[in-house]
């Protein structure tokens, strides 16, 4: 089996795929979303992942390879230790210097996060291009992949939860509120007012950026949502036509397949 970890600032998404002898992957066996904690130890990760696998009737010993995309550098060493201690292989970290097969046509390609690279690879494989991926996470990322399958840039905005926490932290009389679609547009109490402003304000931000990106691209564009808040927000967008919650994971799986094929071609096959 192939274990995939997408480590973000707020949540970590974990997935397990079937892995065949030739290095190909297909069936997504299970996914889990856990909180990201920088103080977590390698053994805590090991105990947690072992328990998650057991809940699906799976065991750590069946995991042949691990691929990781992390935007939390302080956790990288811990994750490496966790993988080497609980599995039989060193993890593959997707980051600068790792060939992904995705041309990155930006001013500073090494600055592009692994999750954004994976989003574009997954999107182009599934939908072709041009495609815009809106990733509703800690930040709301807009990742643009061209008709030729190139990452040509995008945008980064504060995520909805960050905006809500900023209001709570900086305005003494404003409470922390649940993120959900408001029942009406004119609020009659503070909680309603906050939910209306946060929810519809973020939808307005997303659609405003998408409208201008689509205009700049100049042709038909597919807009896809992923990330922890995609199911909450995407349905209200005028431009997002699909939610794909496993898009980043699928992109990481495809990078793994390309990496394994490259190693085998160059004589660096690690074996099963």
UniProtKB/Swiss-Prot annotation:
* UniProt catalytic activity: (R)-pantothenate + ATP = (R)-4'-phosphopantothenate + ADP + H(+)
Q: Which interval of the chain is the signal sequence?
A: none
Active site (UniProt): 115
Compartments where located: Cytoplasm
Amino-acid positions noted as binding substrate in the UniProt annotation, renumbered to this chain: 113-116, 190
What EC number(s) has UniProt assigned to this enzyme? 2.7.1.33
The protein depicted here goes by the name: Type III pantothenate kinase
UniProt source species = Acidobacterium capsulatum (strain ATCC 51196 / DSM 11244 / BCRC 80197 / JCM 7670 / NBRC 15755 / NCIMB 13165 / 161)
Lineage, uppermost ranks: Bacteria, Pseudomonadati, Acidobacteriota, Terriglobia, Terriglobales
